[in-house]
């Protein structure tokens, strides 16, 4: 994957997150600032999904933990085999919102 494809892929992920949160009626605010996408929950807690361009990785940080994902076989996968969408669902649940990104 080249740099342009990397950015396009992550921006598509961000769009999908925002659309799913809105469609499922979650009480959150989403914001993008440069390479950082932030989901802010009603209690002001946050999930941060950000680009790590030098590594071509996608990072996820929340009170559920921090994860680094590489794009393999058309999906974002952590070194331990966890899938990005599953980790994001678990992170949202830890912040009080049940969301299905599948």
Swiss-Prot record:
Record bears the keyword Iron: yes
Record-level GO BP terms: iron-sulfur cluster assembly
Gene3D superfamilies: Frataxin/CyaY
Matching Pfam families: Frataxin_Cyay
Keyword tags: Iron, Metal-binding
Keyword Heme among record annotations: no
GO molecular function terms noted in the UniProt entry: ferric iron binding; ferrous iron binding
Listed CDD domains: Frataxin (cd00503)
Gene Ontology CC: one annotated term: cytosol
Function: Involved in iron-sulfur (Fe-S) cluster assembly. May act as a regulator of Fe-S biogenesis.
PANTHER family the record matches: FRATAXIN, FRATAXIN, MITOCHONDRIAL
Stated family: Belongs to the frataxin family.
Record HAMAP family: CyaY (MF_00142)
Name of the molecule in the record: Iron-sulfur cluster assembly protein CyaY
Gene behind this protein: cyaY
